[in-house]
């Protein structure tokens, strides 16, 4: 007990020191800014409406940049085998920015570790490694931007050349592995302040494809604040090129990052001021430009972090186990009704055709994961005797209302079907299996669904087809960010990998739907002929949905 109290006291002292250091950095930065502006005569009269409009534009670019970096954060977490609801990951990432101004990234790392542990039980060691890894990506991207813009400007000196070489070296596999091992070594003592978790499973971070994807996003993210700096600095009537602005911002940010200055305070600002003066922009205009871009980048990021820290303190973590009970009443409105109806018609028609072709007289079926019962009702309308089960009691209650007294719907899951063996001629599951927590659970689900099938019976598996990279990105990042059906923790099943889950033989495989759910109905009708053409073309395996049919021997 004494040891626990001592550990808790040490953590409280550490948090007080981090907050005090952040406050000291803010005061120092503000004092230095006021001092420079007062010496240059940059009073409120110089802060014209045009200046503030340029600041707003730069701040908007910063927000877009931070959104890209938050997506990169979630991508890296997933590569480190972390499954946390995407909204909780956003909260953890952005909340860390509130302590951006603490020395050596300590506040940012500590707060992210705390929030991710509270909202997703993510091991602290993993959060620390991922945080260090994303900062390495930042430095590499800034080095590339600095080096390439220096070449264009004819200013490739030792500093910019060294940054470019170091950035390119990070693409070497041996360097990546060494960097990851170093990050894991650094993470151990820091992580023990929060938990005694085992060594993080972060081996995939040093994979070449992971690094390439991270670098592409990092380059896009860091070009944007450079563009914001150009917008702020170019509004004083003095010509300054976009390439010069990108070079100045990337070089100054690299310097601030390498010396681990909190938020680059004093270091990055002084470097930016020197670059503007070298480009012929001096005096009040240069000082206000530096003040403006620092406010629009570090200031906006820190303020946004404060907002998300409040969100963390005021909202509970996502409760995945009760997720579908919580969203039962809002489930149907997540996808436009016209697209829901179109998919309902397509999927039930495909199943009817396969059943009539491959089953002689078998009409009894089970909808495993029936949701609100729309597919049960449609299959019964087509003449089949279909029951429904769902793990969510809230969804079952709504399904009973939609189906009426003719249907049998009850609580049950794909892992535990409340029926004896060989009860059904066919079983279907529609967009359910990707919600299971692990590949092992998915294998158990296949075994359980096959258990309740009669010999020769058919198992229909309808799933999202993430073979298409664009659709995988949409379903993995965009859809769970905008809708509450998925949470970003799904484990997608690919049709060509069914042997991973079961040895039941394949009877049929159909690909369908290319148009996104969010398209308005008039556009869907216009593009329907193109969609039908794609569904019957060699591009069909890259569709949005698929149906695989397996037979129980």
Give residue spans per PLM region.
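Predominantly cytoplasmic-facing regulatory/coupling regions of multi-pass membrane proteins
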Residues: 1-94, 151-257, 283-290, 296-318
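Class I SAM-dependent methyltransferase SAM/SAH-binding core
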Residues: 372-416
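A C-terminal cap/extension of S-adenosyl-L-methionine-dependent methyltransferases
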Residues: 474-476, 496, 507-553
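Conserved class I S-adenosyl-L-methionine
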Residues: 317-360, 460-482
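A conserved beta-strand element that flanks and buttresses the S-adenosyl-L-methionine
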Residues: 428
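Short alpha-helix
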Residues: 489-505
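A short, conserved alpha-helix within the catalytic core of class I
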Residues: 436-448
């Amino acid at each position: 007990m004494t040891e626990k109290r001592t550990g808790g006291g040490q953590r409280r002292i550490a948090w007080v020191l981090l907050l005090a250091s952040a406050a000291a950095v803010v005061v120092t930065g503000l004092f230095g800014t006021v001092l420079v502006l007062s010496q240059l005569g940059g009073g409120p009269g110089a802060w014209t409406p045009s200046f503030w409009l340029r600041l707003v534009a730069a701040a908007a670019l910063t927000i877009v940049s931070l959104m890209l970096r938050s997506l990169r954060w979630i991508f890296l977490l997933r590569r480190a085998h972390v499954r946390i609801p995407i909204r909780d990951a956003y909260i953890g990432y952005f909340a860390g920015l509130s302590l951006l101004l603490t020395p050596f990234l300590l506040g940012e790392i500590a707060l992210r570790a705390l929030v991710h542990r509270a909202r997703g039980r993510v091991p602290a060691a993993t959060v620390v490694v991922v945080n260090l890894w994303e900062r390495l990506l930042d430095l590499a991207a800034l080095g590339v931007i600095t080096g390439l813009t220096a070449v264009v400007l004819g200013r490739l000196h030792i500093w910019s050349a060294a940054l470019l070489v170091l950035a390119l070296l990070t693409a070497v596999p041996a360097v990546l592995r060494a960097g990851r091992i170093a990050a894991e070594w650094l993470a151990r003592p820091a992580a023990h302040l929060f938990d005694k978790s085992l060594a993080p499973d972060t081996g995939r971070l040093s994979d070449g494809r992971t690094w390439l994807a991270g670098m592409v996003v990092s380059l896009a993210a860091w070009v944007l604040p450079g563009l914001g700096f150009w917008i702020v600095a170019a509004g004083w009537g003095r010509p300054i090129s976009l390439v010069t602005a990108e070079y100045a911002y990337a070089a100054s940010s690299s310097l601030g990052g390498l010396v681990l200055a909190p938020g680059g305070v004093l270091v990055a600002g002084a470097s930016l001021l020197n670059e503007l003066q070298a480009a012929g922009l001096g005096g009040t205009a240069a000082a206000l430009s530096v003040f403006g871009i620092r406010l629009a980048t570090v200031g906006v990021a820190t303020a946004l972090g404060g907002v998300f820290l409040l969100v963390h303190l005021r909202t509970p973590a996502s409760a995945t186990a009760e997720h579908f009970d919580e969203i039962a009443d809002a489930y149907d409105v997540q996808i436009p009704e016209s697209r829901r109806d179109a998919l309902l018609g397509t999927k039930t028609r495909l199943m009817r055709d396969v059943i009539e072709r491959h089953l002689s007289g078998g009409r009894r079926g089970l909808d495993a994961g029936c949701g609100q019962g729309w597919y049960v009702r449609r299959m019964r309308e087509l003449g089949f005797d279909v029951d429904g089960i769902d793990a969510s009691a809230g969804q079952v209650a709504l399904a009973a209302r939609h189906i009426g007294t003719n249907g049998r719907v009850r609580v049950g899951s794909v892992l535990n079907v409340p029926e004896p063996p060989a009860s059904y001629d066919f079983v279907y599951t529609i967009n359910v299996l990707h919600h299971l927590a692990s590949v092992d659970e998915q294998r158990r689900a296949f075994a359980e669904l096959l258990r309740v099938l009669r010999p020769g019976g058919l198992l229909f598996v309808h799933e999202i087809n993430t073979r298409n990279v664009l659709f995988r990105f949409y379903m993995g990042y965009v859809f769970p960010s905008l809708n509450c059906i998925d949470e970003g923790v799904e484990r997608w099943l690919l049709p060509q990998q069914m042997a991973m889950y079961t040895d039941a033989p394949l009877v049929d495989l159909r690909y369908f739907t290319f148009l996104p759910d969010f398209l308005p109905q008039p556009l869907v009708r216009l593009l329907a002929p193109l969609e039908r053409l794609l569904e019957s073309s060699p591009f069909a395996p890259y569709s949005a949905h698929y149906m695989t049919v397996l037979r129980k021997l």
